[in-house]
Amino acid sequence: DPVAPTVLIFPPAADQVATGTVTIVCVANKYFPDVTVTWEVDGTTQTTGIENSKTPQNSADCTYNLSSTLTLTSTQYNSHKEYTCKVTQGTTSVVQSFNRGDC
């Protein structure tokens, strides 16, 4: 049976923004079958600066874990507000997002 992922998004730390390069991390845990990760910035789908890393299938429950990072310059990051990670599995999507400056 399909297992929906638990999705978490992690905004960059303020001291990372100061370095000039920002990474935003999206994690999808314990899912089956496979998923697709889409990044959106202010509603626009991103196609560059994305790196996905998937763990091998868990032998106990046959699920996967995936980590996806979106890398931007601090200038790019500061010029946008809403950052969204969308994890799609078949016809179902789990969406997590944050607004820059909320915390």
UniProtKB/Swiss-Prot annotation:
<dbReference type="InterPro" id="IPR013783">
    <property type="entry name" value="Ig-like_fold"/>
</dbReference>
<feature type="disulfide bond">
    <location>
        <begin position="26"/>
        <end position="85"/>
    </location>
</feature>
<dbReference type="InterPro" id="IPR007110">
    <property type="entry name" value="Ig-like_dom"/>
</dbReference>
<keyword id="KW-1015">Disulfide bond</keyword>
<dbReference type="Pfam" id="PF07654">
    <property type="entry name" value="C1-set"/>
</dbReference>
<dbReference type="InterPro" id="IPR036179">
    <property type="entry name" value="Ig-like_dom_sf"/>
</dbReference>
<keyword id="KW-0393">Immunoglobulin domain</keyword>
<dbReference type="InterPro" id="IPR050380">
    <property type="entry name" value="Immune_Resp_Modulators"/>
</dbReference>
<protein>
    <recommendedName>
        <fullName>Ig kappa-b4 chain C region</fullName>
    </recommendedName>
</protein>
<feature type="domain" description="Ig-like">
    <location>
        <begin position="5"/>
        <end position="95"/>
    </location>
</feature>
<dbReference type="InterPro" id="IPR003597">
    <property type="entry name" value="Ig_C1-set"/>
</dbReference>
